[in-house]
Amino acid sequence: MIDDNIENNEQTINDIAEDIVETANPEITELKAEIEELKDKLIRTTAEIDNTRKRLEKARDEAKDYAIATFAKELLNVSDNLSRALAHKPANSDIEVTNIIAGVQMTKDELDKIFHKHHIEEIKPEIGSMFDYNLHNAISQIEHPDHAPNSIITLMQSGYKIRDRLLRPATVQVVKKSE
């Protein structure tokens, strides 16, 4: 009889254990699914935060570059004037004039370094290259038998850009089609 009671108790314990496992299995499955869903959300949120950080860094860099655009435009004329002064230096001059020219050259070189530091590039099209309305401003057209139509024949003034943004187009003369 005791053995029967023990067997009955063991059976009851086994039945209770099975009931617990059956009851717990859906909960465990549900919890596992919830864990997977939370892991997926974490991965997506982390990626979204990373993308947002990259977008903000890019926007900050662009804002920094383009914030100086107005100031840089005003400096372009200074650079042009220094270049003109250097282009017209006398061939034979005394020491004082030579020193002044050296000072002008150093100033121009320093300005060019600052332009380079802030990604300001000179647009200086080659004679014979094709006119690009995105980078050039044609102030006149002339006929020329040795050059193709719409090619640049004269560079009047260099242009400048900051990265991809145009500060000032290069001023040019272009060849027009012969009539």
UniProtKB/Swiss-Prot annotation:
Short name of any one Pfam family annotated for the protein: GrpE
Cellular compartments per GO CC: cytoplasm
Family annotation (InterPro entries): GrpE (IPR000740), GrpE_coiled_coil (IPR013805), GrpE_head (IPR009012)
Subcellular location: Cytoplasm
Keywords, comma-separated and alphabetical: Chaperone, Cytoplasm, Stress response
Keyword Chaperone (UniProt): yes
Cell wall biogenesis/degradation listed as a keyword: no
Main function: Participates actively in the response to hyperosmotic and heat shock by preventing the aggregation of stress-denatured proteins, in association with DnaK and GrpE. It is the nucleotide exchange factor for DnaK and may function as a thermosensor. Unfolded proteins bind initially to DnaJ; upon interaction with the DnaJ-bound protein, DnaK hydrolyzes its bound ATP, resulting in the formation of a stable complex. GrpE releases ADP from DnaK; ATP binding to DnaK triggers the release of the substrate protein, thus completing the reaction cycle.
HAMAP family: GrpE (MF_01151)
Record-given protein name: Protein GrpE
UniProt source species: Rickettsia felis (strain ATCC VR-1525 / URRWXCal2) (Rickettsia azadi)
Lineage summary: Bacteria, Pseudomonadati, Pseudomonadota, Alphaproteobacteria, Rickettsiales
